[in-house]
């Protein structure tokens, strides 16, 4: 690399690094808020630490309680507790040691026996402990509909009669307005005003609290007002404009407590310490209302500017380091990239690095159980995998569009003096329409080449009416053509091709293979065989192409999808001598083929042979020009079966050649070849892994519908990577097809639609490939009739089933929970986007059911 190019690259990398660092700084701009006062009115205090939970009967020790009370006594002289169950009954006694006043809580629930125990204990404590200054009978018991107003009033009257301190119940502010009769049975109004739960943005929340307080004072002028819960969570899902972040918690609380102090309100900040156990009752946000975390560490600064992520500088550095590592890998052997391609890759890499660091940081702020930790690790690994796939996709895009010139171009050789040895063309067929195969043989007979033979093998076709016409046609075409009918013959297509090798003419130096539906250009051998003059070349490959794209809308979409595979992926792979050998329009040096043979164990014997050629240190040549056109599948089920075979075969090859591909063990594969074989099939593997994401999304959505108050939508950060990959892949297809293939926008979207329709099929093939060792060879039928609509839809029944599940999950969440928050809307949108490949499959199935023009013409006319 020249010093000028290196300098330019360095400037670009530094500029983009500065851009993303600037973005980290932008979203972490300091915001000023009043300093925390020396004393606040009070804290709501639940004493549980990590690993402790009242639901499991796990209570803190007296020593732990003392540590908490000592810490809180430095900020307030008043605490509120919610129950006297377990060791919480010791809090009034211990609070006396630190001069703390206690608002004692009695937890009222549908459990009558527990209610009686709570009331008895609370009365005893209120009458014997100097620290108890008031008693609260029930906490949001009416709001939860766990007690009737009449029964709550009975409890209130009983406790008021039994104690000397003021008695009240604590409810959300609107419950007091709905049940004003409660005021006659309490000594003060204790109201919760929590703007977060009411979708109020943080910036409007202080005024919201003051307005509600004024309303209550106006409605109950003779009763003292206690704001028994005011607060803001530091983590959790958004509710409308209310965002649960540490920065918003800090700004809101620092502003609110100063305002309430100035105006003389009595209040309790909910809460002193984070309570992870509450997540099971209130959703994930329930764990994060503390001013201190569960380890008793202060969560935000009490003075000075508030920064959203105090550690943002370290995170920015980490994202830059991560991006630089990935970039160094992507730029290996990248000298052919133009500057625009390098800039594009640099930007995408820094974007991925920043998002990955953000995901890791955000998840690190969660309280984890073994279950959530396991899920989080799996999701994190999934996110890492998604970004690896995204980077490989971006790398392919850059090398397809922004490159100075192709490194290895194999143009047609037209010179008469060129090297043109004898060629043996092998045509395998099984149960193929005779008239179609005759067209293939006629095209071979018209080849403009001095010395070649054609060997046709029909293996295992049972009906003589199918193979005997081919035998007769070969005899008619002359001595160049030889026909073999062999039954039984094991090994599918690979077995048939292996059978022909010893029957090949002794003086043939090249063996060519075409499928039985391909009509070749007369110049195919003349233009391409001369490339074997290079002794290192073992394979010469021409792209697959098709001639029936105008027969139907279905085939037009299939044709658009095929073009990218053969005119984008193979072209970029050819630059590093890493093409995937196709089973048609391919030529192999005879000596190499005799040594290696076709792998009968592999369902994609062609691609497997090509890899073994590379492992021997030999090369392949790929031509851009089309020299033959075949027929595409006629139905969606056949289209799926063909792609299933390709994807299943890819996994077979990866498993069988893992040592060579992953470590280069026992082979002469270059790093570029290993990269392309792994990276090229990585998107298919990602499709396979996406099945697990879809299953997980459906299970999680079901939980959100069944227990909506306990299960929140997953963290948005984990839904972003698969969505980003989906839209990037679709955008990449559209962009590449327009730039590299030269098709119009309509055909580019057609390619994207056809590709999406195969996602489920590929996913199944990948999973079958990893968990099975072999499957039968799927022959792609030719000249098949279209199926009816119901048959076509039944061929996509799995896709239809999953689509209905995803749509049902989205609808169920909407009906049960609504769309109150951005993360809820995002999750529902994610479910709908996840359904798009399945919708595409149904569209393709429908199009394949439409009659082809010749079928329409054959229909009887109505009188």
Regions inferred by a protein language model and the residue ranges of each:
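Long helical/loop segments within the catalytic core of UDP-sugar-dependent glycosyltransferases
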Residues: 472-509, 522-603, 608, 612-615, ...
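Membrane-embedded multi-pass helical conduit in multi-pass membrane proteins
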Residues: 335-388, 415, 683-776, 792-863
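Short, acidic, metal-binding catalytic loop of nucleotide-sugar glycosyltransferases
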Residues: 441-451
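The conserved acidic donor/metal-binding loop of glycosyltransferases
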Residues: 514-519
């Amino acid at each position: 690399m020249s010093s000028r190019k290196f300098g330019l690259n360095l400037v670009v990398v530094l500029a983009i690094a500065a851009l993303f660092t600037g973005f980290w700084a932008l979203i972490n701009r300091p915001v000023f808020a009043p300093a925390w006062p020396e004393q606040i009115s009070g804290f709501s205090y639940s004493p549980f630490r990590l690993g402790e939970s009242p639901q499991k009967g796990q209570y803190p020790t007296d020593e732990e309680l003392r540590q908490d009370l000592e810490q809180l006594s430095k900020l307030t002289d008043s605490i509120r507790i919610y129950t006297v169950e377990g060791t919480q009954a010791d809090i009034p006694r211990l609070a006396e040691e630190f001069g703390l006043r206690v608002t004692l809580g009695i937890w009222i629930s549908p459990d009558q026996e527990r209610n009686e125990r709570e009331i008895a204990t609370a009365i005893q404590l209120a009458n014997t402990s100097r620290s108890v200054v008031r008693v609260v009978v029930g906490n949001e018991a009416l709001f939860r509909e766990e007690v009737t107003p009449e029964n709550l009033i009975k409890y209130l009257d009983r406790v008021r009669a039994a104690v000397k301190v003021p008695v009240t119940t604590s409810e959300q502010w609107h419950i007091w307005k709905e049940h004003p009769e409660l005021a006659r049975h309490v000594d003060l109004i204790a109201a919760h005003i929590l703007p977060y739960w009411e979708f109020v943005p943080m910036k409007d929340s202080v005024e919201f609290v003051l307005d509600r307080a004024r309303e209550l004072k106006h409605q109950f002028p003779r009763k003292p007002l206690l704001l028994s819960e005011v607060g803001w969570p530091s983590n959790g899902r958004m509710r409308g404009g209310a965002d649960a972040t540490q920065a918003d918690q800090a700004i809101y609380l620092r502003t609110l407590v100063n305002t309430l102090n100035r105006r003389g309100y009595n209040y309790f900040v909910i809460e002193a310490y984070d309570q992870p156990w509450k997540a099971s009752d209130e959703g994930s946000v329930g764990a994060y209302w503390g001013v201190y975390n569960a380890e008793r560490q202060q969560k935000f600064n009490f003075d000075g500017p508030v920064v959203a992520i105090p550690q943002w500088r370290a995170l920015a550095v980490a994202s830059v380091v991560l991006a630089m590592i990935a970039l160094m890998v992507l730029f290996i052997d990248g000298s052919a990239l133009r500057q625009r391609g390098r800039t594009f890759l640099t930007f995408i890499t820094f974007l991925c690095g920043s998002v990955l660091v953000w995901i890791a940081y955000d998840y690190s702020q969660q309280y984890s159980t073994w279950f959530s930790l396991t899920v989080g690790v799996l999701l994190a690994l999934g996110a890492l995998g998604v970004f690896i796939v995204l980077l490989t996709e971006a790398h392919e895009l850059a090398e397809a569009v922004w490159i100075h010139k192709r490194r290895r171009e194999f143009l047609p050789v037209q010179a008469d003096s060129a090297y043109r040895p004898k060629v043996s063309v092998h045509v395998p067929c099984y149960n193929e329409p005779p008239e179609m195969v005759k067209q293939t043989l006629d095209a071979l007979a018209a080849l403009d080449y001095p010395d070649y033979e054609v060997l046709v093998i029909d293996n295992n076709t049972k009906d003589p009416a199918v193979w005997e016409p081919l035998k007769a046609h070969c005899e008619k075409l002359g001595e160049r053509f030889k026909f073999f009918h062999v039954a039984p013959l094991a090994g599918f297509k690979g077995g048939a091709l292996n059978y022909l090798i010893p029957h090949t003419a002794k003086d043939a130096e090249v063996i060519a293979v075409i499928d039985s539906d391909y009509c070749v250009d007369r110049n195919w051998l003349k233009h391409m065989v001369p490339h074997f003059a290079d002794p290192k070349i073992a394979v010469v490959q021409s792209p697959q192409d098709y001639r029936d794209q105008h027969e139907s809308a279905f085939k037009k979409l299939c044709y658009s999808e095929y073009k990218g595979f053969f005119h984008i992926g193979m072209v970029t792979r050819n630059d590093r001598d890493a093409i995937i050998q196709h089973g048609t329009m391919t030529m192999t040096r005879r000596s190499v083929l005799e040594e290696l043979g076709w792998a009968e164990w592999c369902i994609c014997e062609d691609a497997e042979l090509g890899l073994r050629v590379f492992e021997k240190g030999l090369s392949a040549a790929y031509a851009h020009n089309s020299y033959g056109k075949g027929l595409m599948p006629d139905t969606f089920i056949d289209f799926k079966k063909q792609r299933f075979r390709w994807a299943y075969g890819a996994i077979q090859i990866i498993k069988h050649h893992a040592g060579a591909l992953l470590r280069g063990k026992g082979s002469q594969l270059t790093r570029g070849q290993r990269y392309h074989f792994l990276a090229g099939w990585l998107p298919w593997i990602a499709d396979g892994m996406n099945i697990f994401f879809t299953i997980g999304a459906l299970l999680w959505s079901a939980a959100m519908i069944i227990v909506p108050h306990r299960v929140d939508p997953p963290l948005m950060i984990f839904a972003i990577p698969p969505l980003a990959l989906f839209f990037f892949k679709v955008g990449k297809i559209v962009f590449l097809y327009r730039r590299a293939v030269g098709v119009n926008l309509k055909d580019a979207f057609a390619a994207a639609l056809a590709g999406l329709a195969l996602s489920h099929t590929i996913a199944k093939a990948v999973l079958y490939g990893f968990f099975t060792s072999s499957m039968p060879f799927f022959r792609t039928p030719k000249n098949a009739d279209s199926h009816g609509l119901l048959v076509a839809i039944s061929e996509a029944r799995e896709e239809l089933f999953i689509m209905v599940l995803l749509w049902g999950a989205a609808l169920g969440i909407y009906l049960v929970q609504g769309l109150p928050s951005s993360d809820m809307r995002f999750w529902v949108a994610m479910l709908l986007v996840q359904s798009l490949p399945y919708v595409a499959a149904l569209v393709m199935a429908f199009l394949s059911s439409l009659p082809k023009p010749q079928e329409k013409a054959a229909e009887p006319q109505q009188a």
